[in-house]
Amino acid sequence: MAKPRGRKLLKKQQKDQFEPSNDVEKFEDDRDHQENVYQGDAADSEKSSDPQMFFGVLDREELEYFKQIESTLAMDTFESSEEKSQMVTNVLQEAKGKELKLVTSQICSKLMERIILECDDMQLKSVFKAFNGFFYNLSCHKYASHVLETLFVRSAALLEKELLTPTFDNETSNEDGEVFGTMENMFLFMLNELKPHLKSMVSHQYASHSLRLLILILSSKMLPSSTKNNSTLRSKKSKIARKMIDIKDNDDFNKVYQTPESFKLELREMLTSLYKQYTHNADSRSDISPTDITKFRELCVDKVASPVIQLIIQIEGIFDRDRAYWRLVFNTNDEKDPKEEAFVEYLLSDSVGSHFLENVIASARLKYVERLYHLYMKDRIVKLAKRDTTGAFVVQAFLKHMKEKDVKQILDDIIPELSILLNSNMDFGTSIINASNRLGCYLKDEVVNQLIKKYYPEESENKNILESCLLLSSSTLGNTRDDWPTADERRRSIFLEQLVNYDDQFLTITIDSMLNLPEERFLQMCYHGVFSHVVESVLQTKRVDTIKRRLLLNVLSKDIVNMSCNAYGSHIADKLWEFTAKLTVYKERIAQALVDETEKVKNSTYGRQVWKNWSLELYVRKRWDWKKLIKEQEHELFPNAVKPQPKNQQFKNNGNDNKRSSDSNYSSSSNFKKQRR
C-alpha cells in the first residue's frame, strides 16, 4: 500500500490533533438534558452556572462592630480561654440571621473563619445549619468558599468524634433550645443539596476547591493545611493571602479522619452520577462518543478542573475496581490510538497537562502506567527529560513508580545526559539519586562523575561547588536588608546536602570549597537561614578525617559565642559538640569561650540551649565529670579505638613482646602518616 502523503496525510493529522477549546469551563452538554441523571431539573441547571451570591450588606454600625471583633480575635490578647470563649458566644449571638451577609463580605468572612476555628461543637452545628440551602451558592463565592472549607474540616473532626463516642440520642440541642441532628446527617443533607451542581462545581474557579475538600473527607484522606506551600487544596495566591491575614489552622488540619460507612456509599453515588453526566449514560466504554471523550480530556488540561479530575482518579479505586474515570481519559488496549497519542503529546507539552499526568501516574495501576510508557514515551525518554517545565516531571514520576527493569532502562538513557539536564532542572539530580539508591546504588559511579563534571570540573582553575551549585556570589548571603532566603536558594541547598550524604567525594569537595572561601564569607553562611544547613551537613564526625575537622574548627571556633546566640548558628554550635570528639583541645577551647561570655550566652534563648547541650554547668562546677562525659562520648562514637598505653609498658614485657609491640607501633605510625597524607 502506498504511503499516505500530501493533503490526505495533513487532513488526517489535523483530525487526530488534540486542541482544547478555549471555553472549557462552561462545558455545556450538546445532548438533551433528559439523558442526565437528575432529570427535570432544568431550572436548577440554569441556576448552577450563575448562582445567587448577594445576600444583602451590613449597615455601617454592624460593619464597624464586626471589624473591631475581627481585629480583637486576630491579636489574641485574651487573659484566659474562658474570656475568648465568651466573646465567640457573644459574636455568634450578634451574627444570628446575618451569617450569609458576613461570609460574603471580604472583612467579615475572615471573622467567620476565626469564629469557626474557635467555636465549640454545638456552635459549629449552629453555623452549619445557618448555611442550609445555600451551600452551593457560598461555594461559588470568592470569600465564602474559604469559610466553607474551614467549616468542612472542623465538621470532619466532629464527625470522627461522634463516631468514636456514639450516643443513643440522634438529636442534641443548645442553650437556646435549637435542635440539631448528628453531624453525619447534617453532612449528608448538605451533600444532597450539592449533587445537582457537581458538574458545574468541577470547573468553577472557587467551588472546585470546596468539591476537592469534600471528596477528601468522604474518602478519608489527609485534609491538607491551608497555609503550607505544599498544600494540595488552596491555590498559590490563596495560601499567600492567608499567611498575610494571619489566620492559623487549628489542630483539625493535616489529619486523616475516620468517617461512617455511609460516606463511602455517598462518594460512590456522587462520582458515578457525575460519570454518567459526562458520558451521557453510556453503558460501556465503547458506547461513549468520541466527542464526550474529547470534552472530558479538555477538562484534564483545564487549570481549574484538572486538580479535581486528578483527585477523582486517585481515589476512584476505593469503590470502582474498573477505574472508569481512568478509562474515560485513556484507552486500556495494547495498541496505539492516534487521538490518544495526540492527547498524550499535548499532556507532555503543556504545564497543566504534565502536572495532571505526573499525579495520576502516582496513583494509577502499574499496568496502565506501563502501557502509556511503552506505547508513547519509551523511545524518546531523553527528549522528554529535556522539556524542563513539562515532560521532565513526568519522567521523574516514572523513576518513582515504574518497575525495576524500566527504571534501569530510563537511568541508562538519562545518566549520560545528566550534566546537561541539571542546567535547567536541578530536581532531576534528586530523582536520579533516589532511583539509584533504591536499586542498590545502580550506576552510582556514573552519576557521581556526571555531577562532578557539572559542579566541580577538573579543568576549571577556580572550581568551587558552593559557587556552581549554590550561586553564592548572586545570593542573599551577607545582605544587610534582612532578605528572606529565596525558594531557589532553598532548593539548591537541599540538593547540595543530598550530594554530601550521597557520596564521600561530595563531602570532601564541599569542605574544600568552604575552606577556600574567605573566613568572613564562610562564617556568614553559618548565619544564613538556608546555607547554614549546608555547613551543618558537613559536620559528620565519622566521615571527615581529623585534619579536615581541625581546619573547619579553626574557623568555626573563632565566632562561637555569636554563633551560639543565633537562631541558625546555634544548630551548628550544637553539632560541634560531637564534631570535636577526640579533639579535646578544640572542645575545651569552645567551652571556655562560651563560659567567658556566660552572661551573653545565658541571656539568649538559643544560647541557653547550646549551654545545656554542651553540659557547661558541669564544665564550670565539676570539670572532671565533664571530662568523663567526653570520654564516654568518644567511646560511644569510636568503640573500636585502641587505648593508648604508657610509654614504659614496653619495658615490662619480654623480648618477643617487645618485638611485637615495636612492630605494632611502627604499623600504627605508618597508618597515621598515610592518613595525614
From Swiss-Prot:
It comes from the Eukaryota. Its main location: nucleus. One of its GO terms (biological process) is endonucleolytic cleavage to generate mature 5'-end of SSU-rRNA from (SSU-rRNA, 5.8S rRNA, LSU-rRNA). Keywords: Nucleus, Repeat, Ribosome biogenesis, rRNA processing. Residues 13-35 have a biased composition (Basic and acidic residues). Residues 1-12 have a biased composition (Basic residues). Residues 646-655 have a biased composition (Polar residues). One of its GO terms (cellular component) is preribosome, small subunit precursor. GO terms for molecular function: RNA binding. PANTHER family: NUCLEOLAR PROTEIN 9. Belongs to the NOP9 family. This is Nucleolar protein 9. The gene is NOP9.
